[in-house]
């Protein structure tokens, strides 16, 4: 309670002191009010995206970073004409660049829609089905684990303790006979 009045069993009226930090809805002190105002709310729908660095987490560094030299290489001693090599390089690079752009413009939005739906369903199932099932299972298994623990302590602990005492009295002596 963050302030108020109550009557004790003898009929005395007491006022409760207001907590120094206030409650969670209306902070009482200025420090908490400033902290709450400083926190900026980030909306996933309005955040800015980086158009220069489009892979900030480096997901595709070793997968799709394929250049001309990674695909086509002429070993020492078997070289084509320099003009052919330059034209091949240009053709490969430009074709890869523009065909990727064409494919991403035609198929990118539908695939993004499909992946968005997929991850929305996955998030929904995880939040509303998986986590509650796991919590429910842990609550149920806790009862079983207590019963199991009692059984182990009741039946197995004395048995293993007795076996330990039996084997603790075994003495081995080695003699070397010449």
Curated annotation (Swiss-Prot):
Interaction with CAVIN3, as annotated region: 82-94
Keyword Acetylation: yes
Family affiliation: Belongs to the caveolin family.
Residues recorded as bearing N-acetylserine in the entry: 2
Gene Ontology cellular-component terms listed: caveola; endosome; focal adhesion; Golgi membrane; membrane raft; perinuclear region of cytoplasm; sarcolemma
Name under which the protein is recorded: Caveolin-1
Function according to Swiss-Prot or TrEMBL: May act as a scaffolding protein within caveolar membranes. Forms a stable heterooligomeric complex with CAV2 that targets to lipid rafts and drives caveolae formation. Mediates the recruitment of CAVIN proteins (CAVIN1/2/3/4) to the caveolae. Interacts directly with G-protein alpha subunits and can functionally regulate their activity. Involved in the costimulatory signal essential for T-cell receptor (TCR)-mediated T-cell activation. Its binding to DPP4 induces T-cell proliferation and NF-kappa-B activation in a T-cell receptor/CD3-dependent manner.
Example GO BP: cell differentiation
Subunit structure: Homooligomer. Interacts with GLIPR2. Interacts with NOSTRIN. Interacts with SNAP25 and STX1A. Interacts (via the N-terminus) with DPP4; the interaction is direct. Interacts with CTNNB1, CDH1 and JUP. Interacts with PACSIN2; this interaction induces membrane tubulation. Interacts with SLC7A9. Interacts with BMX and BTK. Interacts with TGFBR1. Interacts with CAVIN3 (via leucine-zipper domain) in a cholesterol-sensitive manner. Interacts with CAVIN1. Interacts with EHD2 in a cholesterol-dependent manner.
Record region (Interacts with SPRY1, SPRY2, and SPRY4): 149-160
Topology feature Cytoplasmic, residues: 2-104, 126-178
Positions of region (Interacts with SPRY1, SPRY2, SPRY3 and SPRY4): 131-142, 167-178
InterPro entries in UniProt: Caveolin, Caveolin_CS
GO terms assigned for molecular function: molecular adaptor activity; oxysterol binding; protein kinase binding; transmembrane transporter binding
Residues carrying lipid (S-palmitoyl cysteine): 133, 143, 156
Modified residues (Phosphoserine): 2, 9
């Amino acid at each position: 309670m963050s302030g108020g009045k109550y009557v004790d069993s003898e009929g005395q009226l007491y006022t409760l002191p207001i907590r120094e930090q206030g409650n969670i809805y209306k902070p009482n002190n200025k420090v908490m009010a400033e902290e709450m105002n400083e926190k900026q709310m980030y909306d996933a729908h309005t955040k800015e995206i980086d158009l220069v660095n489009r892979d900030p987490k480096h997901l595709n560094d070793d997968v799709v970073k394929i250049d001309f030299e990674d695909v086509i290489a002429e070993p020492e001693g078997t070289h084509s004409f320099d003009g052919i090599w330059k034209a091949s390089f240009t053709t490969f690079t430009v074709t890869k660049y523009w065909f990727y752009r064409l494919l991403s413009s035609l198929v990118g939005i539908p695939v993004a829609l499909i992946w968005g739906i997929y991850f929305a369903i996955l998030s929904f199932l995880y939040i509303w089905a998986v986590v509650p099932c796991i919590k429910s299972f842990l609550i149920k298994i806790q009862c079983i684990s207590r019963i199991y623990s009692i059984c182990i302590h009741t039946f197995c602990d004395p048995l293993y303790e007795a076996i330990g005492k039996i084997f603790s009295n075994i003495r081995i002596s080695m003699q070397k006979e010449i």
